[in-house]
Amino acid sequence: MDYKGLAILLAVIGSAALAFGAQYQNDAVGDQQGKTTKTAGSLSLKQVLGLLRRPKWLAGTGMIVVALVFQITALSLAPLIVVQPVGAIALVITSLLNARVSKTKLNRLTMLAIGLCVVGIGSFVAVASTIAHEIILTDDLLWDVLAIMAVILVVFGILLFKQGSQLKAIYFITGAGVIYGFVATLTKVIIQRILQGHFEWLTVLCAAMLIVGVALGGWFVQNAYASGPPDLVIAGLTVIDPMVAVLIAATILGEAQQANPLTILGFLAFAATAVTGVLLLSQFHPQILLQKRRAALWAKRKRL
């Protein structure tokens, strides 16, 4: 029986929970940071740990956990390349919610950027749902995923701890998106191996890598909240995350073996559309423009 429709519905519900969770966490990070301007990479370890004492941040975390439950359930019912991109719906919800909360009027370029993200990812899902299929996961395939993820975690871990205070929002968002793309893949892998009756030490290793990925990705996300609006953060996660997950699913896990050259071109075009939306959002969102003006004014005052 085909459960793709149900899986997409569950992913949509999870996206709504993710949007509200992101807004709550973003507000809590702003309160914790005590900032008048947003500076990239400005969260210290003490500030991150301080979030654990903030009810608003905990409420946001709870909503994100609910979103993950729906996402994991959806992943158990349909291929990764169908489920993961549906999260782009969270971008629309987050943008409207943040505009209302922050009393920010979205400009035309921001609306265009959101539209590009949603159309790009929506088209991606439509194509993926027609050619995606489950495969039997071998140990060799799993080792490939783990090896690549280990390199990714080391690279981004070094980048965060060496250059964190100098990074802009788009870099934190990209890092979080790439890491969570692997986290989504490992989640799907663990579900598959349990269903296939292969729960052994390699599966436990996957779970350990998943936990490390969630922790490091979470650090990137909190710093992204400290340096950009929540809809930009969600845009990065709901575009970069699924793109990475789908790339892994298609090239390593073989979920897109039925794709012909025309389909692949479509994937690339839709991916480019969505990524363009994220880049536009990172440059022209009203809150980003306001941050740039404040930063320029602050720099001017320091020179006087």
Model regions and ranges:
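Polytopic alpha-helical membrane proteins, predominantly small-molecule transporters/carriers
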Residues: 1-304
